[in-house]
Each structure stands twice: as structure tokens, then as C-alpha cells.
């Protein structure tokens, strides 16, 4: 079973939870889609590992 990853959008009021997605690859795809359709900064958070990736309309940054 895939782990669940939460996608957040960065807002001036702090992080806004968008959705929970099963599987890291699917979460990255969904985050990229969100960044293209609703520009802004997004990040993926894992309960186990914390923030693992950030996405803007321009690029994806993987967090080691």
C-alpha cells in the first residue's frame, strides 16, 4: 500500500491543505498540475519524513 502524502499551497496566511494523495509519484504529478492550473507555491508533506518536495510554476525542488 502506498503512503499518503499531503499537498499544501503556500498562502500569505500560512499553508493551506489542498488534498491527500496516495503514492509519491502521483503526489508530484498532482502538485505539478496544480502549479500549472492555479499558479503559486506548493509543497508535499509526509507524516513520516516532513516536507519532501516543493513546486512552483517554474520548477520542482526535491528536498533531501
Regions found by a protein language model. Name each.
Residues 1-3, 35-38:
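Short, surface-exposed loop and linker segments with low hydrophobicity and enrichment for Pro/Ser/Thr
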Residues 15-26:
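A short, exposed loop/beta-hairpin motif centered on an aromatic-Gly-Thr core
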Residues 1-16:
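Short aromatic-glycine-(Arg/Gly/Cys) micro-motifs in beta-strand/loop hairpins
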Residues 10-12, 24, 47:
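Generic structural motif
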Residues 36-64:
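Short, mixed-charge low-complexity intrinsically disordered segments
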